[in-house]
Amino acid sequence: MFTTAFAQREQTQPGGLPLDLFAAIESLKKELNAVILAHYYQEPDIQDIADFIGDSLQLARAAAQTNADVIVFAGVHFMAETAKILNPEKLVLLPDLNAGCSLADSCPPKEFAAFKAAHPDHLVVSYINCSAEIKAMSDIICTSSNAVKIVQQIPKEQPIIFAPDRNLGRYVMEQTGRDLVLWQGSCLVHETFSEKKIVQLKVAHPQAEAIAHPECESSVLRHASFIGSTAALLQYCQTSPSQEFIVATEPGIIHQMQKLAPNKHFIPAPPINNCACNECPFMRLNTLEKLYWAMKNRTPEITMSEDIRLAALRPMQRMLEMSN
């Protein structure tokens, strides 16, 4: 069923890999009663073998609703942690434990605890792209899909800390008119996009629409016809009459865009420097080979203390309730 060049190359590698990785993974899924959840930023082969592909909110909902005994999370560490928070009794596997997140890493728990203590009357709304420890210090979690909706439901007289992404925080401020206290974190991928090069692309492709993720800087967002989460970007490119799009987010999503709108053309937004990469180095640590070995060996497993899990669960549950 799956015959990509990547899979064919892996079949010839030494080290005990099966001849057909895709078939072996499908067999392990049945043996383990496992589900593979993958983010849109994963490499195409992983997206193609996943049981569910989505953005952070969709993946959180899928993790909360699954009947599988094993969750294999093809994403980054905080996403797999989220699955474990919602499913303490299940085995949650991450193909590569080094698949971290520059945004999550930009908000260390000790420093954030001090920041929170300096604003004792503030409600803490944290973007899901943060560690379990930060979630445990939060009142409500949000995603790029529902951040505006979440903040709009909070009484206007209630002051708010928004963490960790300053760019998403600024976008939420613009959309809601609320004055948020922002933690100054950011995503290395979404801050590499070049405003100048996007403008040049728009000149070279006058019929193209620029679409962007709200983690991008304001200088990039101002040139976008549409701003939204990865799921929203996918939906927009299917329904828009435009035939060409400049895409300002991690280019892994273009695989799904091309599958869902095969007659349209998608141009990845270029980075500031030619040597810079707009691919997430952490997302790309996961490979089909690592996915197989994680399932075969039932490791690396995501674990956390029960007190952190319970504290992180409460704001996650509030998000899911407020997003319905």
Curated annotation (Swiss-Prot):
CC cofactor note: Binds 1 [4Fe-4S] cluster per subunit.
Annotated keywords: 4Fe-4S, Cytoplasm, Iron, Iron-sulfur, Metal-binding, Pyridine nucleotide biosynthesis, Transferase
Binding site for iminosuccinate: H39, S56, Y127, I128, N129, S144, H213, P214, E215, T230
UniProt-listed Enzyme Commission number(s): 2.5.1.72
Signal peptide: none
GO process annotations (BP): 'de novo' NAD biosynthetic process from L-aspartate
Chain residues that bind [4Fe-4S] cluster: C101, C187, C280
GO terms for MF: 4 iron, 4 sulfur cluster binding; metal ion binding; quinolinate synthetase A activity
Sequence similarity: Belongs to the quinolinate synthase family. Type 2 subfamily.
Name of the molecule in the record: Quinolinate synthase
Organism annotation: Nostoc sp. (strain PCC 7120 / SAG 25.82 / UTEX 2576)
